[in-house]
A protein has these predicted regions:
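N-terminal amphipathic/basic leader segments beginning at the initiator methionine
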Residues: 1-25
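Short, well-ordered amphipathic alpha-helical segments that serve as non-catalytic structural scaffolds
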Residues: 22-32, 60-63
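Glycine-rich phosphate/diphosphate-binding loops that line cofactor/substrate pockets in enzymes
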Residues: 29-45
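Short glycine-rich or small-residue beta-strand-to-loop segments that form or flank ligand, phosphate
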Residues: 43-52, 75-82
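Short glycine/serine/threonine-rich phosphate/pyrophosphate-binding segments
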Residues: 53-60, 85, 117-125
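Histidine-anchored nucleotide/phosphate-binding helix
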Residues: 54-73
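Active-site histidine-anchored catalytic micro-motif
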Residues: 70-92, 104, 111
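An acidic, phosphate/nucleotide-engaging active-site surface
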Residues: 90-133
Length: 133
């Protein structure tokens, strides 16, 4: 077998920086029209995953704090599949490693593995989400 000639390829992916990411999160949530779709006092699940979000704990906390300030009762759900060994306890531990805990977030963190199909994607694939949500 002959190996064809190889060439070095380098890709630089742009990584924009937000000067005030928590402030941008607040602005986006407040301008999202959420209050027209969910009544004050309603519960809202905040999905927190494990796929390389920089400063994920501060992003999650900004989301939770904004929702609380708007009169909602947020809680966090693990938004990951096989990470954490695909177990509730493993995902709870993984979130804790990212400093996402009930104590640090000020809300409940639910990592049960039960999920429901919410609908289908434009290409017909099922969309699953945490049953607690």
């Amino acid at each position: 077998m002959t190996i064809p000639p190889l060439a070095l390829v380098r890709q630089t992916i742009p990584q924009p920086v937000l000067a005030d990411a928590p402030g941008e999160i607040r602005r986006l949530i407040q301008s999202s029209g959420l209050s027209q779709r969910v009544p004050r006092g309603g519960t809202i699940a905040v999905g927190v995953g494990s796929r390389g979000v920089h400063a994920i704990a501060s992003m999650a906390r900004a989301t939770v704090d904004t929702l609380k300030a708007m009169g909602y009762r947020p809680f966090i759900v693990a938004a990951m599949g096989s990470h954490g060994g695909a177990t509730a306890e493993g995902q709870r531990q993984l979130l804790a490693e990212y400093h996402v805990t009930p104590e640090s977030m000020g809300v409940e963190v639910k990592t049960e593995m039960d999920s429901l199909v919410l609908g289908k994607s434009p290409v017909g694939l099922p969309i699953y989400f945490d049953a607690n949500a």
